[in-house]
């Protein structure tokens, strides 16, 4: 392979929030040794200072990459979210700068599904309330309000990777599984898709939420929806904190319309483990509250570390953007010559202008890869030419109207 445009030991990776050591091991094994690692999140000023000369940043859910922070990152090439969600990153601002954002949407699927199963079993048996009372010295041995999971109906809202895993695990306990999704999905096992959310809420003994955070899911479980739930049923939310209207949930618990709940995510969460946590749900003994630990298992964090680090390495090594959330997706083979990358506004004439540059210089294009999204185009061009010719072509590419970013990869 031709010499890379920037030596790997000069490419800086900024990793915050204690991403798993497997990520560091993967980066070092690939030749990336210039790594700045922080166990916790950085405040805005520290973040801006550290990211200023970083080429890559890896973060989890507490660090917020706003447009202001992204614009302070003068050399930033890509962002890796070592978690499922990417709502902590201004995706549009990153796209405008030609910066792809990668995440690990499936690596903690099993961990979240197992947590929900555990919460479901505890709630059905009334363990949270019995445990709280026992801690206060109250012995309350009763069968009333305590149930087996077998034969109960589980309603899953959002039948994606976590929802399907949950359904499989619940069926193994003898539960009847129903799900609601905005798209028609192929059921796994004996699960049944329900066409209307209200029907799912009416029939389910336990309702578990597994939806993304977007305008359509904000407070999707409000007073109206909770009132449609079966009296004495249970609500579990291990998806996003904005999905459940917390005051409405408190009202349903206080009136005993719901027998209990398990909440792992909240509308606002402490920035660090040393910050206090407050919620009106704290007053209810029959509610399980956990600090956003759905994906916090050693296995999940290791898988996430390997997956996201691998995506950053591939993008740095050969320009592949497969599974980027804000960027045209291209999976690329290695090439022995020179590789140039051009990120541009999706408008007519750009590809023609690019090809004209090489035609005028008498340079043959060995391979060309193009992928577009609604707003952006991403072209990777492999050529057989010396470094001076490639550098001259790069400068001409940068001058094309509509160019967001262009660089010589190697």
From Swiss-Prot:
GO MF annotation: an example: identical protein binding
Annotated source species: Escherichia coli (strain K12)
InterPro entries given in the database record: ACT-like_dom_sf, ACT_dom, AHAS_small-like_ACT, D-isomer_2-hydroxyacid_DH, D-isomer_2_OHA_DH_cat_dom, D-isomer_DH_CS, D-isomer_DH_CS1, D-isomer_DH_NAD-bd
Protein name: D-3-phosphoglycerate dehydrogenase
pH dependence of this protein's activity: Optimum pH is 8.5 for the reductase activities and 9.0 for the dehydrogenase activities.
Activity regulation, short description: Displays feedback inhibition by L-serine. Inhibited by glycine.
One GO term of the biological process aspect: L-serine biosynthetic process
Primary gene name: serA
PANTHER family: 2-HYDROXYACID DEHYDROGENASE-RELATED, D-3-PHOSPHOGLYCERATE DEHYDROGENASE 1-RELATED
């Amino acid at each position: 392979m031709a010499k890379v445009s920037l030596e790997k030991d000069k490419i800086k990776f900024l990793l915050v929030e204690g991403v798993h050591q497997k990520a560091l091991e993967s980066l070092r094994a690939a030749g990336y040794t210039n790594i700045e690692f922080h166990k916790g999140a950085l405040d805005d000023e520290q973040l801006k200072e550290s990211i200023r000369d970083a080429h890559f940043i890896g973060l989890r859910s507490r660090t917020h990459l706003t447009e202001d922070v992204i614009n302070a990152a003068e050399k930033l090439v890509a962002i890796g979210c070592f978690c499922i969600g990417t709502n902590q990153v201004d995706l549009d601002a990153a796209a405008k700068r030609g910066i792809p954002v990668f995440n690990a949407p499936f690596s903690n699927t099993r961990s979240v599904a197992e947590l929900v199963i555990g919460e479901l079993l505890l709630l059905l048996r009334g363990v949270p309330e019995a445990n709280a009372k026992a801690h206060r010295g109250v012995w309350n041995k009763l069968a009333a309000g305590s149930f087996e999971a077998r034969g109960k109906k589980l309603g899953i809202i959002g039948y994606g990777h976590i929802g399907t895993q949950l359904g499989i695990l619940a069926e193994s306990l003898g539960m009847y599984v129903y799900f609601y999704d905005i798209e028609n999905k192929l059921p796994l096992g004996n699960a049944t898709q329900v066409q209307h959310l209200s029907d799912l809420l009416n029939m389910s003994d336990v309702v578990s939420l597994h939806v993304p955070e977007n305008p359509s899911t904000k407070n999707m479980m409000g007073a109206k929806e909770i009132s449609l739930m079966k009296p004495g049923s249970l609500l579990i939310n291990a998806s996003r904190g904005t999905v459940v209207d917390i005051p409405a949930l408190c009202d349903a618990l206080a009136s005993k319309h719901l027998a209990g709940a398990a909440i792992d995510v909240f509308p606002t969460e402490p920035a660090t483990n040393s910050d206090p946590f407050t919620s009106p749900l704290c007053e209810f003994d029959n509610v399980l509250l956990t600090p956003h630990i759905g994906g916090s298992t050693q296995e999940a964090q290791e898988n996430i570390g390997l997956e996201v680090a691998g995506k950053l390495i591939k993008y740095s090594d050969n320009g592949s953007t497969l599974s980027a959330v804000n960027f045209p997706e291209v999976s690329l083979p290695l090439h022995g010559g020179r590789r140039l990358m051009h990120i541009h506004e999706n408008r007519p004439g750009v590809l023609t202008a690019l090809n004209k540059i090489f035609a005028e210089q008498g340079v043959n294009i060995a391979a060309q890869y193009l992928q577009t999204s609604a707003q952006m185009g991403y072209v990777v061009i492999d050529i057989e030419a010396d470094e001076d010719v490639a550098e001259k072509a790069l400068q001409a590419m940068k001058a094309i109207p509509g160019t967001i970013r262009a660089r010589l990869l190697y």
